[in-house]
Amino acid sequence: MRRGLVKDPDNADLFCKEDPERIFVDLHEIGHGSFGAVYFATNSTTNEIVAVKKMSYSGKQMNEKWQDIIKEVKFLQQLKHPNTIEYKGCYLKDHTAWLVMEYCLGSASDLLEVHKKPLQEVEIAAITHGALQGLAYLHSHNMIHRDIKAGNILLTEPGQVKLADFGSASKSSPANSFVGTPYWMAPEVILAMDEGQYDGKIDIWSLGITCIELAERKPPLFNMNAMSALYHIAQNESPTLQSNEWTDSFKGFVDYCLQKLPQERPASLELLRHDFVWRERPARVLIDLIQRTKDAVRELDNLQYRKMKKILFQESRNGPLNESQEDDEDSEHGTSLTRKMDSLGSNHSIPSTSVSTGSQSSSVNSIQEVMEDGSPDLIMSFSCSFDSTSSLVHKKDHAFIRDEADHRDPRPELRPTQSVQSQALHYRTRERFATIKSASLVTRQIHEHEQENELREQMSGYKRMRRQHQKQLIALENKLKAEMDEHRLKLQKEVETHANNASIELEKLSKRQFVGMDKEAKVAAADERRFQQQIIAQQKKDLTSFLESQKKQYKICKEKIKEELNEDHSTPKKEKQERISKHKENLQHTQAEEEAQLLSQQRLYYEKNCRLFKRKIMIKRHEVEQQHIREELNKKRTQKEMEHAMLIRQDESTRELEYRQLQMLQKLRMDLIRLQHQTELENQLEYNKRRERELHRKHVMELRQQPKNLKVMEMQIKKQFQDTCKVQTKQYKALKNHQLEVSPKCEHKTILKSLKDEQTRKLAILAEQYEQSINEMMASQALRLDEAQEAECQALRQQLQQEMELLNAYQSKIKMQTEAQHERELQKLEQRVSLRRAHLEQKIEEELVALQKERSERIKHLFERQEREIETFDMESLRMGFGNLVTLEYPKEDYR
């Protein structure tokens, strides 16, 4: 990736486009870690002093490294608080990110390294107070630092406490990733993948461990393998302060921070009100501590400068030393250096000989490389480039160059060149480069970083594996959730489809019934008209027959009367005519009455039969309505039964899917735990082999070094023998002179012979004692070395055995906890499935009861309506005078 070019346009605004190598000059390494290196630098544009953190994102895990850089930059951009490091920008150059921040003097762990003793309680309280304020700010914005330790708590010149290194931070709370530094990790972080999530309370635990670190120089379990420390933290009780010199307030604060259960652990705001950080303390406590540390660092660096300058001058005068000379001078120099450091340590509490020796060895190596080049200019440049203001310049050979104006050599052949003098003047005038970290400490960090690369890779690989396992679990959970959502959506669509189909079927049934009713009504109307027409036609026929019968009867009666009158000759014709007319009128009247009566009977018959026909039609319509409602209710019942069968089938399929998904999730979790445990075991075995190799290498070096040590001790015994011989020789001379003076001259020869024999005998005894001392020393040293090495081997075996047992116990606990978690998940699922099935069955029962109730009510309402309709019809018939209509027998069948 070229400078300033970001492939992702969403992240382009995170980085500055300028070339960082042109902007930031005078880079000096001031720290080293797994991410890379931190440099002191000057902004050439603003002349501002900054710290530059270089992070490479090339090589293995390139994408993961790039994402970590993106996350840290985004996190830093959001921070605006006096107790968090100030972010100034980020640049890209040759697959390296330059993260620019404000410059701080050093970290709280540097104080411990420089003074080689714990901090005072008031100093710990001041540092803790500042760190707590930064944590309270983070936690109030749902952020988690996740890597609180003394090395990530920085100090500025005015004594301001700053939280730094947000590479492990999280912008979401709760979180569940396995990140942080092992010895400071909270138990819930170690168990994050196995048991669930954590929140900002993990920073409180790390702060408690940091307090112990500041009070005891190292965090708890620091003498243990980092992996073993993880297992120990996860299953053992919380650590406490070991010494009784601390106040109850401090002890209570630490115990409060290190509550095993997160819910019992206090929040950062609550801790800010604790007496330990709230009580009164001197305002300049941190400023004074920083000043003392700077003075101690300056003294140590000056001592290192004088030591290296002496070596350079000796080599420039005497040339290369042979091996024996180097050994002797190394021994003498080590003795004198130890005396110097002991004296200096009692006054200034600065690092012990071990630290300076490490720096010495690295510096000597680099100087020897310079000497082998044969360039006097390079030698002069090195000897005159030590910075009096504790500035650090990191070369590729790990030499930290200092400029010391007070150590100019008057000899012209050893003075630096003009260019070197100007460079020294440049560093001498740059007084702003103040630090509380010595050059030897930075050198040691670099060497430790190189030497512990295998262990660091193992730990980073373990963290990466845990994070990868977490990602796999989350991916599977998301996949299963999507599958379940899809399944539920499918079931929901099936239910909706069934409901729509049922509604359509009922609507079709309703339409069909409506059409049938309409058709029946039309048929009934047609039948009624046909029935009426039949009655009318019959009545017309009857009326015609009746009229014809009347006509015949009229004629018969008329003829009969005429015959009777014709037989009666006595009656006058006129009277006969009157009688015939009167009889004709009476007959016509009678026939008219009979016709009217017939018409009345026909009309009554017509109306009554029409009424009866309407009643029959109404009863038939009622039967059709009953049939329709029976059909509709049966249809609804069938649909509801089909719906219930579908719901039960869906519940069964959901149950099978849930059990299958839980089985898949638990199987993956167990597979990952087995893989994790296998990796942990392999790491432990690899660590055991490495420790055994290191111990074997150490013993081999001791065996190789033993002849040299024995030679030194033999020389000491030889010197003692020589001194004794000299004393005896002096005593012999004194005794000889005395006896010669007090004895006659004739006895001198005898006395001299006697004294000579005595001297020879005593020297022979001394020689025998010398040989015996040498042999005893040889035997005792060999035996002592064998016993010491055997004791070391035994101690290492015991330690490794304890760590292996601790690992086995931890893995057994994790396995048991996981199995218990799986059992709880299975029980929870069974309860959920059982409860859901019970709710479904209850719902089905309630719906069936509601359906039966609806059926009964609708049939009841139908019968009541039909009865009212018939009753109304019959009442109307009664009012119309049809009281003798045939009563319709209603069906007694109850469809309920």
Swiss-Prot record:
Annotated membrane topology: Peripheral membrane protein
Any Pfam family the entry gives: Pkinase
Enzyme class: transferase
Low complexity: compositionally biased ranges: 349-366
GO BP annotations listed: DNA damage response; DNA repair; mitotic G2 DNA damage checkpoint signaling; positive regulation of JNK cascade; positive regulation of stress-activated MAPK cascade; regulation of cytoskeleton organization
Biased segments, Polar residues type: 334-348
Coiled coil: 450-513, 545-650, 752-873
Protein name, entry field: Serine/threonine-protein kinase TAO3
UniProt source species: Xenopus laevis (African clawed frog)
Gene that encodes it: taok3
